[in-house]
Amino acid sequence: LSLRRQRQMCIRDRSCAHLLKELPDFNSSLAPSGKAIIRKKYVNIGFAVDTPDGLLVPVIKNVDQKSLLQLAAEAASLAEKARTKKLSADEMQGACFTISSLGHIGGTGFTPIVNAPEVAILGVSKATIQPVWDGKAFQPKLMLPLSLSYDHRVINGAAAARFTKRLSDLLADIRTILL
């Protein structure tokens, strides 16, 4: 991964970790009985890696407790292991939330599928400069298409909208997650 892409991924992952703590229903799973919600006390995030044999999802554990440099190093190491078929089963287990990024391929959006027992997954498409009306004129703005899929048994549409809105706010001003 390029250094620029690693930085972007770390900021995105750290922002999601921040939200998983702020909005704990997204950091949960449904009990096998379907009658209880299990809230996680840890924040483990899976990220999809495109390999010649298909997508693999390594998991960065305790994302909320790691620095951006630690996240970058671990993500790069896990992605390389995935591409070279050296990823262990343990390195692909325990995610609370998954992020699938197809921005490097292109496209404006997609519908990611929730990886049970997780209750949500974030899809990230390619960022592009778009004209945005500021009330007086169109201004060029960097826009990042986000697609959030979620289990309606745990998360409702309003909560999902708040999650994506809050994530957009965090990504637009990363000072909150750096403190």
Task: Mark where each language-model region is.
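C-terminal catalytic/motor cores of large multi-domain enzyme assemblies
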Residues: R5-Q8, R12-L179
